[in-house]
Amino acid sequence: MNGVKSWTVTLVFYFLILAVLIANLDGSSSLFGIIPKRANSSQKPPHLHLQQLGITGSRLLRFFQDNLLEFEGASSLPGDEQPGISLYYDSFKKYLYDAPHGPPRPLECNPDKSIVAKLTKDVQPIPVHSHNDYWRDLPLFQGIAHGAISTEADVWIYPKPTNADTPEDEYILAVGHNEVFLDPVHRTLDGLYTGPLADMLDQVNCVEGHKSGVFYDSPEDTLFFYIDFKSQETHLLYKLLMDKYLKPLMDKGYLTYFDLESKKLVWNQITVILTGDFPKDLGVIDNGENGYYNDNKRYAFQEANILEPTALEPNASVVSTSSLSNLLEKCGYNERSILSQGQMDNSLTKCIKSLISQSHEAGLRTRIWGVPNWPVSFATNLWHQQVENLGVDLLNVDNLDLAQSIF
């Protein structure tokens, strides 16, 4: 009998030791609530402490990329909750909105603790257009954090998701490059762009009569916001854009506009450019003669063509654009000829500069798209030539890190 008791005690002691070892190996919080978990000296600060990081811009992006999974609450979501855009995007946005473990806190007008301060304090605005911005890991935020003064969203008309609280016959504007891969739940124009822009501007425009944009150290700079029309129903798309997505920004005075009475352009925090298959008729743009909102103001500007800068009616545009291939053809060149030289020669730069100058004389800024981005040395040579020799106002850029490094 004593032998049985002895073996029983031995087995209990053996299993207890085994359980302690397993608990230490798998990181369990405790052993049946009896033996507390040993403190981990290498444990990173919780996600909540990120509110005091003090780093901004591209450094902030790299910090999140390198440390995302190290922070409490960032490596997993509660229950069955799934990432909306991605774990990276969702966690980054929660940091910006000062809400690491729950819904965003009510926005307060406090420039020093604003989203704008977290993103762009000590960031120099650069003459860059964030091409295909909606493809980036952090749409809108990534371009702004690098100082890009222009962004872009491709939009499609899409039926409301079945779980929405609105009638099924209404539509939303989904953001994406290809209609097949649209996500009308998470990737919408208001979710990715107009909503965050309104939140950012609300936090820094505290004093009436004082305008502040998305760049903390250059609050007077506007953000060019390209809306690329993808759906064939252009008039409906424009109506949705104006009625549902831009009106909240207009109501708060955040949109650049052309005064149809005084014939003056008034710059504000966001300048909307229509590109792609947008309506060409100003009667549609202005909804008649008194402006779309019947206030004698034009809030959306048609993209002009560098090769025909005066083809549109005066004051219909603020930016003209052309592909590099069209400019090369106009000047009697092709891409192969400049690739072999590694840059544009004097004759070509003189020709393109004359075209750029025509746009400038018409009061238009300029952007050239379709510029090769490889080899890297060739791409950077063309960037320098666009800015220094041609006078291009917006560089069309995919690689934001590389572009930021040359300014």
Curated annotation (Swiss-Prot):
Keywords: Signal
Stretches assigned to coiled coil: none
Annotated InterPro entries: HAT_RTT109-like, PLC-like_Pdiesterase_TIM-brl
Transmembrane among keywords: no
Keyword Iron: no
A GO molecular function held by the record: phosphoric diester hydrolase activity
Alphabetical list of SUPFAM superfamilies matching this protein: PLC-like phosphodiesterases
Domain of life: Eukaryota
A biological process term (GO) from this entry: lipid metabolic process
Signal peptide: 1-23
Similarity comment text for this entry: Belongs to the AIM6 family.
Name the UniProt record assigns to this protein: Altered inheritance of mitochondria protein 6
Species whose genome carries this gene: Zygosaccharomyces rouxii (strain ATCC 2623 / CBS 732 / NBRC 1130 / NCYC 568 / NRRL Y-229)
Lineage, opening ranks: Eukaryota, Fungi, Dikarya, Ascomycota, Saccharomycotina
